[in-house]
Amino acid sequence: VAPSVPAVRSIGVLPALYRLLLGTQVNRTRLAALGGLGMAAILVGFAIGRSDPVDPLVTGAAFINSFGLSVTVPVTTLVFASAALGDLTDDNTLVYLWVRPVRRWVVVVAAFLAAVTVTVPLVVVPLVLAAFLTGGGRDLVTGTVLASGLGVITYAGLFTALGLRVRRALVWGLLYILIWEGFVARGGDNAARLAVRSVTATILASWSGADLRLAVLAPRTAYIAPFVVVGLALLYATRRLNRQDVA
């Protein structure tokens, strides 16, 4: 149980917390398994380029959207972001951070930044390389950078909060990705707008000109929405951490 009036420290402790949480997320099993998704994307991108498609831009965009933005980005980000604070909650060690005289938002931001740091090289880099190898050109590469990067940030905010909200956050996150984004969101534009995938698909479609599933947002909205979602998710996580009993 937390002290009734915890002391607080400044943002100066953020780097130390960031390094601590980064270390808890990185292990060989996760890196090998999720790095495999990136390698698969690179190999398929190379195969598409070698097949000499009629329209490399559209073909490449369809692949990046269906595999990269629909599987690689959300699943990889889920594994690391949900674990950032979720693992500590599940094994009852979050209390060791909770009783420290540190502002709760600093803990949440450190967890979010740690998740993004691990995920970006595992997701954005291989997807950009895959986009390049398809032969789709500069527009496809640029669209992939923006869509995958903003996708990682958005999912990281949501899944960091999810890790605090529920136990077994990985399972709940997979249900969201597979059921809501994979099926329900395809039932209509209103449902699609509640899926992060609509943001990434819209950004990629705006650069590639391809007709992509779930690309239902206005481009301006697709660029603004990630920052709104992340802000709200981290605010919720901070409030949750302030109120919950972790011991």
What positions do the PLM features span?
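Aromatic- and glycine-rich beta-strand/loop motifs that create alpha-glucan
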Residues: 2-35
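Short hydrophobic, aromatic-rich alpha-helical segments embedded in or entering the lipid bilayer
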Residues: 13-16, 189-212
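A generic "structured core" feature
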Residues: 25, 65, 108-110, 238, ...
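Short coil/turn motifs that cap or connect alpha-helices
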Residues: 30, 103-104
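Secretory targeting signals
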Residues: 35-87, 91, 108-176, 185, ...
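Short helix-to-coil transition segments within interhelical loops
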Residues: 96-103
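Alpha-helical transmembrane segments of multi-pass membrane transporters/translocases
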Residues: 209-247
